[in-house]
C-alpha cells in the first residue's frame, strides 16, 4: 500500500565530528583557503590573456607564461590538497566525501599537462591555446564542485548549531 509521506534517505554528513575537528585544526585548511582564491585569480588573468591572443594574435608569450603559472598553481594545490585529505580523512586522495571532485581534478590536471606537452612539442600556437581553454573549462567545473562542497559544509555546520 503506497504511503502518503516521503521517506527521506539518510544522507552521509560531509565530515564526521572527528574529521571536522581535524579539518579545523590543520594548517593545511588555511593553505587550501589561500591557494584556492589565488588559483582563481591566476585563472582569470590567464583566461583574459589567452582570449586576447585568440582574438588578436597578440601576446602569445604572456598568455603562455600565464598558463604555465596556472598549471604550477594547480599542481601545488593538488599536492597540498592531497596532504589535507590525508590529515582530515586518513587517505591522500579519493576520500568518499571528495571522491568525484578528486576524479575530475585528474581530468583538469591531465588537460593542463597536455597543454604543457603541446607547448614543449612545438604544436601550433592556436592548438596550444585551445587545449588551455579546454583545461580552463574543466577547471571551472571542478572549482564549482569544490564551491558546492564548501557550501554543503557550511550548511551542515549551521544545522549543528
Describe the function of each predicted region.
Residues 2-10, 30-54, 60-88, 97-151:
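Hydrophobic cores of alpha-helical transmembrane segments in multi-pass integral membrane proteins
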Residues 16-29:
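Cytosolic juxtamembrane amphipathic/interface segments immediately preceding
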